[in-house]
Amino acid sequence: MVSQTTSEVQPTMGVKIFSAGVAACLADIITFPLDTAKVRLQIQGEGQTSSTIRYKGVLGTITTLAKTEGLPKLYSGLPAGIQRQISFASLRIGLYDTVQEYFSSGKETPPTLVNRISAGLMTGGVAVFIGQPTEVVKVRLQAQSHLHGIKPRYTGTYNAYRIIATTESLSTLWKGTTPNLLRNVIINCTELVTYDLMKGALVNNQILADDVPCHLLSALVAGFCTTFLASPADVVKTRFINSLPGQYPSVPSCAMTMFTKEGPTAFFKGFVPSFLRLASWNVIMFVCFEQLKKELMKSRQTVDCTT
């Protein structure tokens, strides 16, 4: 993200934020069924016996959902997901370079690992607080099932916002902020820092040019590292956000209940769809993000030259 040649015009902060938001929305649209499968696998086993477990594996979950609830169910919560990327990814990714440059200001040497981690912590934390209501609605819509005559809690995205705010409280829209903050701090730092370091190593050692293959490989490596480290916090976040009022007194209580009833492997439920989703999301997002920045700056240069 920062390893551009000196001959290139550096993208402005506005270009970075816009490019990150557009790229993240496109990645979300393409990978959303994997995210829905991940959520269903993560909440599976919660208050259920083994005989009621219906989902087995990524493809099995997607197939079961499509057959029993219809193909549109795979995209339930997508509007909230798009809203989340606009308010969340555009900030955590789009502001990363700018904040990193701020921490490195006055220094001629490349950004240190501490500078990169600090930038990831700051942009991730701010983005989580702003985008948390969209995360709550997205998870609730993805988790609700229409089977066995169960009346869905919500009929749509804006209906979910209204019902949550009026029947539970406005603060419920920020439910699960703590585990989501932990998850996204891990994700933001691991994802952006790993991508940044991997891309820098490939380009600086002349293994690959700063182009699509380099961006693709860097995104895949970042996706695996991020999924592995963030999985426990991701599962706890999903369980806590989807829980009924009073089901879990606190986030630690949710984690302890999972551990005692389901064992340590519960914290890695949905790992495969989570990795497939995050890896593919990373590839689409980072490749589109890099290309959008370049094309927008080229367009800007062309306009400047003609005026």
Curated annotation (Swiss-Prot):
Q: Where in the cell is it found?
A: Mitochondrion inner membrane
Q: List the GO cellular component terms.
A: mitochondrial inner membrane
Keywords from UniProt, A to Z, are:
Ion channel, Ion transport, Membrane, Mitochondrion, Mitochondrion inner membrane, Oxidation, Repeat, Transmembrane, Transmembrane helix, Transport
Which segments does the topology annotation call Mitochondrial intermembrane? Answer: 1-10, 97-116, 196-212, 290-307
Q: Name one GO biological process term.
A: cellular response to hormone stimulus
Membrane-related topology note: Multi-pass membrane protein
Q: Describe its function.
A: Mitochondrial protein responsible for thermogenic respiration, a specialized capacity of brown adipose tissue and beige fat that participates in non-shivering adaptive thermogenesis to temperature and diet variations and more generally to the regulation of energy balance. Functions as a long-chain fatty acid/LCFA and proton symporter, simultaneously transporting one LCFA and one proton through the inner mitochondrial membrane. However, LCFAs remaining associated with the transporter via their hydrophobic tails, it results in an apparent transport of protons activated by LCFAs.
Gene behind this protein: UCP1
* Known catalytic reactions: H(+)(in) = H(+)(out)
State what protein this is by name. Mitochondrial brown fat uncoupling protein 1
Tissue specificity note: Brown adipose tissue.
What the entry lists under PROSITE patterns is as follows:
SOLCAR
What organism does this protein naturally occur in?
Phodopus sungorus
